[in-house]
C-alpha cells in the first residue's frame, strides 16, 4: 500500500501520483491519496512538504517520486513483510 499525502491544486502532488500510476501495474501496489487540506494534524505533520509518500505506513520520500528509488524501496518493504 502506497499512501500519498497531498493538497488540492498541488502540481508536484499530481506529478507524483502520475509517476506512481505509471509504475502501479508493473509493480502491483495500491495507491491511496489523502488530502491534508483542512486536517490540522496532517497539515502540522506534512505542511509544505507535500507530496509525502509512504510505503506500508513508513515514510519513503517527499516532493517527487524517483522511479528507481521507489522500486528499490518497495522491494525492501516486501522482503520485510
Walk through the language-model features, giving the residues of each.
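N-terminal beta-loop-helix "entrance" segment that forms/cooperates
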Residues: 40-47
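Non-catalytic, surface beta->alpha helical segment in thiol-disulfide oxidoreductase systems
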Residues: 55-81
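Thiol-based oxidoreductase modules, predominantly thioredoxin-like and allied folds used
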Residues: 29-40
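Short helix-capping segments at alpha-helix termini
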Residues: 24-28
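Structural micro-motif
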Residues: 47-53
